[in-house]
Amino acid sequence: QLFTESVIDEVLLSMEKDDETSPDEILELFDLSQYRDRHPLSLSGGQKQRVAIASAVVSNREIIVFDEPTSGLDFKHMREVSRILKALANRGKTLLVITHDPELVMASCSYVIHMEKGQIKENYPLDVNGAKKVLNFFRI
């Protein structure tokens, strides 16, 4: 959900006051610099998605929930989101990624919790056997 009058304000809203990262660096990282002063609601679905992800990333929370983070993104930006998720995990962040995208699971996740009807059906590490389970689940 987007709350402010501009893309830059959306990022600033989530940033910690003592964060030394420039909000413009974050916009550049997410390929949003050209939309800096635009109202978030004037953006395409994929652009809005990237603004929301950028805001989550700069919030500096220990646990970040991503609900369908690649929804509405083109392939280039899907790969970039995957790279950013891995980088966040490598920095010690705990990420909960809710997705129906098997490529994102395989590229970005280390553990799978398979849910059905609000119940955990199965959970496993994304090792060789886990990867086979994911591919079988998505029938790939």
Q: Predicted regions: what is each one?
A:
Residues 20-35:
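Conserved ABC ATPase "signature" region
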Residues 39-43, 47:
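Conserved ABC ATPase signature
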Residues 53:
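Hydrophobic anchor residue at the start of the ABC signature
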Residues 64-67:
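Catalytic Walker B motif of ABC-type/P-loop ATPase nucleotide-binding domains
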Residues 99-100:
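H-loop/switch region of ABC-family ATPase nucleotide-binding domains
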Residues 105-107:
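A short, surface-exposed alpha-helical micro-motif characterized by mixed small hydrophobic
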Residues 119-139:
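Conserved beta-strand-loop-alpha-helix hinge in the C-terminal portion
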